[in-house]
Regions:
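Predominant activation on well-ordered alpha-helical scaffold segments within soluble catalytic domains
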Residues: 9, 13, 53, 109-110, ...
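Flexible glycine/proline-rich
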Residues: 22-27, 36, 78, 119, ...
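Structured loop/turn residues at beta-strand edges in well-structured enzyme cores
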Residues: 50, 86, 107, 237, ...
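Electropositive phosphate-/nucleotide-binding environments in soluble metabolic enzymes
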Residues: 2-6, 20-23, 27-28, 32, ...
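Short, low-complexity N-terminal leaders and the immediately following helix N-cap/first helix
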Residues: 1-66, 117, 133, 319-343
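Proline-centered turn/helix-capping motifs that create local helix->coil transitions or kinks
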Residues: 146, 254, 351-354
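Short, glycine/charged-enriched hinge/interface segments at domain edges or termini
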Residues: 5, 11, 38-41, 55-222, ...
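Helix-rich terminal scaffold detector
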Residues: 1-5, 165-294, 298-303
């Protein structure tokens, strides 16, 4: 019996578990979830540093106001200060350079005049002026980035500053895709009478990559039960997830569900009260491998991926698998179907009163071009036959 979209999503999340960890280089860690807490092994910065280009001095030398000091050297970023500051002396310093011993203030260049041998400070400065103390940004031992955090550019920079070149992140799910149908032909090959191009394979493969999965295999099988068992069985080896398209309904040539049963996979649900995508099926193996059997119609396959596979991949990657809808206003009527949640492909605009949506062209499940330019899905509840123009509607953004 078909289940509601809410119950289907909840069932998926009950079975989608966070995967184990792996260490990756920082350049490969963008968008990954940190697997363990990152504590600072040392202070950042590790030494007192200059915040300005200028001169390192002793603040006491300016207690009486303007002062002329003898230049005794230079401190550059990236090198230890090779000279100390004593009363009556100063050291030229660059931004980020270590503050020389004896200095306790930095005077910006624009507050001075210099003839190369001496520097005159315009007025009194206080201790600590433009000095970045050790640990100003991060203290040694501090918890800086917590486990489960999605690593963005700022997080990568912070980890680098803490000398963590290979953070431990949640492993990417290994995903296989299997298309079904005698009629499918690869792009670039001659098209026989009655055949069609396999658009689902490339579309779902791209969707897997975009959602953070690792596509390890993309296979196809004709409309034969024993062949389907063999191909799916091989595709299920050493993966975390299998996604099939087509062959999931109740016709005489639909063999995916019987094949999965023969392979020992238990159906969690078979059918969702959803338009398009009603035949969508979800099964789980004894080892926890997830199988999403999506319809063959291109739009239905992509809808099923967005609504059910993406939350599963998010959860497996250590992200939140919850997808919270946003309120919007329908600028045109949105047709629903009582008894099923109807998902309308839309384009959005942000206006003064919030988000507005308009449906794309034909909402038929075989019109793949209706997905072009779509940035949101509008959800017409299963107890409504439509949403009128000007009425509120829940939407989920897609990216």
């Amino acid at each position: 019996m078909a289940v509601s979209i809410e119950d289907a999503r909840a069932a998926v999340l009950r079975h989608a578990e966070v995967l184990d960890a792996e260490d990756v280089f920082l350049d490969d860690a963008l968008g990954r979830a940190l697997a363990v807490d990152a504590h600072a092994p040392n202070d950042v910065p590790p030494f007192a540093a200059s915040a300005m280009d200028g001169f390192a001095i002793r603040a006491a030398d300016t207690a009486g106001g303007a002062a002329t000091l003898r230049l005794v050297g230079e401190a550059k970023a990236g090198a230890a200060a090779g000279v100390a500051v004593h009363s009556g002396t100063a050291v030229r310093i660059s931004t980020g350079a270590p503050v020389p011993d004896g200095a306790d203030a930095i005077v910006p260049q624009e507050m001075t005049t210099s003839d190369g041998a001496t520097v005159t400070v315009d007025g009194q400065v206080a201790r600590g002026y433009h000095v970045r103390p050790p640990g100003e940004d991060i203290r040694s031992g501090e918890l800086v980035v917590g486990a489960g955090t999605l690593l963005g550019p700022a997080e990568l920079g912070v980890l680098a500053s803490m000398n963590i070149p290979r953070p431990s992140v949640v492993r990417r799910p290994r995903v296989a895709i299997a298309g079904t149908g005698d009629e499918l032909t690869d792009p670039g090959k001659p098209l026989a009478p009655g055949a069609i191009r396999d658009s689902n394979g490339p579309a779902l493969g791209g969707a897997v990559h975009r959602a953070g999965g690792e596509l390890v295999a993309r296979v196809r099988v004709g409309d034969d039960l024993e062949a389907t068992i063999s191909v799916l069985g091989a595709a299920l080896r050493d993966v975390d997830m299998l996604i099939t398209s087509g062959g999931v309904s109740v016709g005489p040539h639909d063999h995916v569900r019987p094949a999965l049963a023969r392979l020992g996979y238990s159906e969690v649900f078979a059918g969702v009260k959803l338009k398009p995508g009603r035949p969508t099926t979800f099964a789980v193996g004894e080892d926890g491998t997830l199988v999403f059997a999506l319809p063959g119609n291109p739009v239905s396959a992509l809808m099923g991926f967005r609504l059910f596979v993406v939350p599963a991949l998010d959860a497996m990657l250590g992200r939140s698998g919850e997808h919270h809808p946003v309120k919007a206003t329908a600028d045109e009527p949105l047709e629903g179907a009582v008894g099923r949640t109807t998902v309308i492909r839309c384009r959005t605009t942000l206006q003064d009163d919030g988000w507005h949506v308009r449906p794309t062209k034909s909402q038929d499940s075989h019109i793949l071009t209706s997905m072009l330019g779509v940035d949101a899905l509008a959800l017409v509840p299963e107890d409504r036959d439509g949403i009128g123009a000007g009425e509120p509607v829940e939407i989920e953004f897609v990216g």
